[in-house]
């Protein structure tokens, strides 16, 4: 399980970061 999480974690971060960046720009 740890190996799968190690692979998923970076992918989830890359998938979430753009969404968070858009939200921050909208708040500005």
UniProtKB/Swiss-Prot annotation:
Processed by the macrocyclase-peptidase enzyme POPB to yield a toxic cyclic octapeptide. POPB first removes 10 residues from the N-terminus. Conformational trapping of the remaining peptide forces the enzyme to release this intermediate rather than proceed to macrocyclization. The enzyme rebinds the remaining peptide in a different conformation and catalyzes macrocyclization of the N-terminal 8 residues. InterPro entries: Amanitin/phalloidin (IPR027582). Signal peptide: none annotated. NCBIfam families: amanitin. Probable toxin that belongs to the MSDIN-like toxin family responsible for a large number of food poisoning cases and deaths. Belongs to the MSDIN fungal toxin family. This is MSDIN-like toxin proprotein 8. It comes from Amanita bisporigera.
